[in-house]
Amino acid sequence: AGLEQFYRHRHLGVTLEATDVCRRLLELWGPTIDAEGMTFESAEAECALQQQAAGLVTAYLAHAPADEKPLAVEVATQAQLFDPMTGEDLGIPLVGIIDLIVGGQDGAVIADFKTSARSSEPLEIFHELQLTSYSYLFRQLSGKTEAGLEIRSLVKTKTPKIEFHGYPARTDVHFRRFFAVVREYLDALDAGRFNYRPGFHCGMCDFATSHCREWGA
């Protein structure tokens, strides 16, 4: 929420100081926690997380380029899925929210924010489908090719660290893999094959306590 506020103001030509961003972060804390239904072990635990969040935001703003120009911030996007290799309409839209698009020397750079517990070079394959989906949405809606993509990591170490990891524009290889995965997913739905793959996404699934409990029983 804090970085969204910073970049929305920057998009309007207003640069907020880190203290202002942290203040807005804390003002939005309560409503955001209520909306997400989050709970804490104690008031002290919640206060510690607030301080951690403010520290990460402050470190990020000190690290980010001072002259960075946001083109779009926290933008909800949707585009019909057309296989770029064949032109086939897959009959469903791709829906996503892109954290940030900034103007670079060679064109637009698509950035996604992540938090992590430790510093490390992220495996590109781990983020490949997400980055490719953002690239697809950007190209469909803008008619342009991105200059690159970034994972911007806010590392929750004792002294907060900020790491930017850049990746090149997506290629035909990326899109072939992406659409192969989409087709596999659609084929599985059509055939009624619902494989048991528990993970963090289960918390967002309507079938976590019903169909999945019955799978393989």
Feature names for model-found ranges:
Residues 3, 53, 100, 134, ...:
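A residue-level signal for conserved active-site and pocket-lining positions in enzyme catalytic cores
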Residues 2-83:
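A non-catalytic, helix-rich entry segment at domain boundaries
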Residues 1, 5, 55, 59, ...:
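Residue-level signal for well-ordered alpha-helical scaffold segments within enzymatic catalytic domains
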Residues 36, 110, 114-116, 181-189:
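Short amphipathic alpha-helical segments and their helix-coil junctions
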Residues 72-141:
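Non-catalytic protein-protein interaction segments used by genome-maintenance enzymes to assemble
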Residues 40-44, 61-63, 86-89, 118-122, ...:
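Short helix-to-loop capping/linker segments positioned immediately adjacent to catalytic or ligand/cofactor-binding
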Residues 1, 51-54, 129-132, 199-203:
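Non-catalytic, well-ordered alpha-helical scaffold segments
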Residues 19, 122-124, 137-217:
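Metal-dependent nuclease catalytic regions and adjoining charged, substrate-binding loops involved
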